[in-house]
Amino acid sequence: MDLLIENARLVTMQEGEQGYLPSPLARVGIRSGKIVALSTVTKGEDSAETESTLNPDHYEQTIDLQSKLLLPGLIDCHTHLVYAGNRANEFEMRLNGVPYEEIAKQGGGILSTVRATREASEEQLIELALPRLDGLLASGITSAEVKSGYGLTLQDEIKMLRAAKALEQERKVKITTTLLAAHALPPEFKGRADDYIQHICDDIIPLVAEEKLATSVDVFCESIGFNLAQTERVFEAAKKHGLHVKGHTEQLSDLGGTTLTAEYSGLSADHIEYLDEVGVRSLANSSTVATLLPGAFYFLRETQLPPIELLRAHKVPMAIATDINPGTSPFADLTLMLNMACTLFRLTPQEALRGVTQNAAKALGYGESRGVIEIGYDADFSIWDIEHPADLSYQVGAKRLVGRIVNGEYVSHGGL
């Protein structure tokens, strides 16, 4: 549908300070899901050609934003949205002093989610994911990445990826899928991590690539996950089959996973609390984005902060995501992550907003088509009843989203 947006205060998130400051009242022309024209309405500023391009008579639908703020659609670039089971009881047990080792002995931890996810059908996984997705949509997202990683068998990982892709048919949202079979060691491979990695490389990755079920492959490279050599084997297999790579790296220790991810031109290295300057320099010398996950940091009551000042000094792009998952970040609100990134990690509101727009798009490989309001980019927007973009990081709980536009189609979240 061709759509004309009128009387919008634009926050384009283009490079520089100007991209963060709301514009005077402006118009945006959309055709075939793309932005085709941008204009302020200051008399005499627009060329005759621009005025013609933005003529309301040339559009099927016109929306008057009545001075509301128009931002790029927010992007959640790291989620574990699809899973079955509930681990609220573990949350309560931990707060009553039960150590994680004891919880795991009682059948809890990540393997409890694996069991529940294996038992669920694809349709059940979709149904369970929708309320979580609805929470993210209510926080202004138009795109989300969704990982597998709770199946840990060929059949169940594929089931998860299919469920994730099916979410696009249920809601107005763009879903990008990532294979995370190397998330944990399944019980069938206990004590045989190398054999499991071989299974991922020989069996799971080729089929996922052949059926186009994911665009990226991720690995939990950590002392309690998979080591550098195992991670590199997965990265090699992913590259061989034309898939991007990403890494869960330096969350609990400094293994060098971020540097490895950068060496393989990974889209992003995520968590990175224990990242050192060598790792930061590797990011600076690559196109790999540093993705911050403040929800997990908060929920786990971590104390090791990611190296924000080093990332700034080396001009490494920083993205922010919910990391929504049942064990360490049960948060379905991306704007809450903006607040956490500012209060816990001391990002500025501008850095935080760029982390869920321009830099989040880069973390998914869409840096040339999403995350910025610019001619030629996807017509994905979020519409807000706020005075300034900093309000998104500053306020928590107020429902300020008016609507979203996905591929040029308007979705009301309270209406105009």
From Swiss-Prot:
Residues annotated to bind Fe(3+): H78, H80, H248, D323
EC class (word): hydrolase
Annotated GO biological process: L-histidine catabolic process to glutamate and formamide; L-histidine catabolic process to glutamate and formate
Protein name in UniProt: Imidazolonepropionase
Taxonomic source organism: Vibrio campbellii (strain ATCC BAA-1116)
Recorded metabolic or biological pathway in which this protein acts: Amino-acid degradation; L-histidine degradation into L-glutamate; N-formimidoyl-L-glutamate from L-histidine: step 3/3
InterPro entries recorded: Amidohydro-rel (IPR006680), HutI (IPR005920), Metal-dep_hydrolase_composite (IPR011059), Metal_Hydrolase (IPR032466)
Chain positions recorded as 4-imidazolone-5-propanoate binding sites: R87, Y150, H183, Q251, T328
Highest taxon above the source species: Bacteria
Main location: cytoplasm
Encoding gene per record: hutI
GO CC annotations, alphabetized: cytoplasm
